[in-house]
């Protein structure tokens, strides 16, 4: 069994460490609890611009010198902006661990936000927004997120063209000063490293970094807005997105929700692939997945079909979810559970993955969760639990977004759901 260490450092950092002494690598992840939800409503895209510009120069180094310093120790680094967090990840040899932390402290604590680099990033973000027009699936994701989560959590990380035009370097500095503090940081470490040394290194390099107050941990309210919206676009295919409320990652029914999604969309023998694509030939692609911001959970169904078959595809997607409570078989349940457990044991076996999983545990549960505990909850799911979940979470309030030549026609599959008022075409 893994021996996790979890503590709050005097500097304000919440730290989790998973020692893996047989591996000659260390991975760490720094999550700053400020993502797009922390942006002013008229400056959407700001959080991503800050993340993209942090490593373009510090008080000590230029952006190129900073990259050279990471390369000199063979560190693999990455960063990203999400709804609730801005994340920085690193994998490095144990002997270079402290240097890697030192470099991250430098870019997080003393960025200079060079004007030329900032301007380039604004232009790149604008180009990426324009590029969404050539990615129908990404466009549907953007549109449905607004309806599923509301004006705060439903923001797109890139922002909008009109808000990007208002963002200045001074805005980036203000966002960094207000949100980048040790008290807003969750740090996970996994690999060949003594937990005490990990704590000492992070304490030393982040001591005095802003407030130690544990900010950014309260869930942000979701504003779910059921309804149907169509976005006309000259495409050969029709994109369909469906969303309905599920449960959050800390809910007792979360393992049941995971297994349901495994039955629907977990592998080549899953229901959606078999019934919607293989047997009926309705779709080019089809999937079901979940998203779980803190305190909320959403289930999504997505498909790409022909405009002529969009109504049939929509009805079939919902029918396959409903049908689970009628004819689920024990062998089907066991296959889904085996797939989930195998995925946890194989894809999650790399040091980087274990580090990311530990960060997720701290973020969602406030503690490290042993893999054995997660596996036990998955394997305990029964057919009766799945039926109870589906009965307790009816699909009677849906967000539906279509993108393509024609809207849904208002078939019985659409109108039988409460709150399904059709919005004007966008």
What are these regions (language model features)?
Residues 4, 8, 16, 65-214, ...:
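Charge-rich, well-structured scaffold segments of protease-associated domains
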Residues 13, 18-34, 44, 213-270, ...:
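His/Glu-based metal-binding/catalytic segments typifying zinc-dependent metallopeptidases
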Residues 1-4, 225-227:
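Short, hydrophobic/aromatic-rich segments at coil-to-beta transitions
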Residues 273-274:
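Phosphate-proximal small/polar/acidic motifs at interfaces that engage nucleotide phosphates
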Residues 45-56:
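Active-site SXXK
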Residues 38:
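Catalytic and substrate-binding regions of extracellular carbohydrate-active enzymes
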């Amino acid at each position: 069994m893994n021996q996790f260490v979890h503590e709050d450092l005097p500097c304000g950092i919440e730290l989790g460490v998973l020692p893996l002494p047989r591996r000659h690598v260390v991975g760490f992840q720094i999550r700053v609890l400020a993502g797009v939800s922390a942006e002013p409503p008229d400056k959407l895209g700001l959080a991503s611009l800050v993340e993209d510009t942090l490593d373009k120069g510090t008080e000590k180094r230029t952006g190129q010198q900073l990259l050279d310093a990471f390369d000199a120790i063979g560190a693999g680094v990455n960063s990203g902006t999400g709804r609730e967090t801005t994340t920085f990840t690193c994998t490095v040899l144990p002997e270079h661990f402290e240097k890697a932390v030192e470099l991250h402290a430098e870019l997080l604590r003393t960025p200079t936000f060079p004007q030329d680099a900032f301007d380039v990033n604004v232009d790149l973000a604008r180009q990426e927004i324009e590029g969404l027009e050539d990615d129908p699936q990404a466009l549907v994701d953007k549109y449905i997120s607004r309806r599923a989560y509301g004006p705060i959590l439903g923001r797109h990380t890139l922002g909008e063209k009109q808000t990007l035009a208002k963002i200045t370097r001074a805005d980036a500095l203000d966002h960094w000063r207000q949100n980048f503090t040790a008290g807003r940081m969750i740090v996970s470490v996994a690999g060949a490293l003594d937990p005490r040394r990990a704590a000492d290194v992070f304490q030393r390099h982040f001591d005095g970094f802003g407030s130690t107050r544990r900010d950014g941990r309260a869930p942000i309210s979701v504003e779910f807005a059921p309804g149907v919206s169509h976005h006309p676009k000259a495409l050969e295919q029709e994109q369909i997105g469906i969303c309905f409320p599920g449960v959050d990652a800390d809910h007792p029914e979360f393992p049941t929700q995971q297994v349901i999604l495994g039955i629907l969309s977990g592998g080549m023998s899953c229901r959606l692939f078999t019934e919607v694509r293989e047997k009926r030939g309705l779709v080019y692609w089809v999937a079901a997945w979940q998203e779980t911001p803190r305190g909320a959970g959403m289930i999504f169904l997505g498909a790409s079909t022909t405009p002529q078959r969009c109504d049939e595809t929509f009805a079939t997607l919902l029918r396959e979810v409903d049908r689970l409570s009628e004819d689920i078989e024990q062998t089907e349940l066991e296959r889904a559970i085996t797939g989930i457990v195998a995925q946890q044991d194989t894809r999650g076996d790399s040091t980087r993955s274990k580090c990311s999983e530990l960060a997720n545990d701290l973020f969602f549960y406030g503690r490290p969760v042993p893999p054995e505990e997660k596996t036990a909850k998955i394997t305990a799911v029964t057919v009766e639990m799945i039926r109870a979940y589906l009965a307790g979470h009816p699909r009677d309030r849906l967000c539906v977004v279509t993108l393509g030549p024609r809207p849904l026609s208002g078939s019985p599959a659409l109108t039988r759901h409460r709150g399904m008022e059709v919005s004007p075409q966008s």
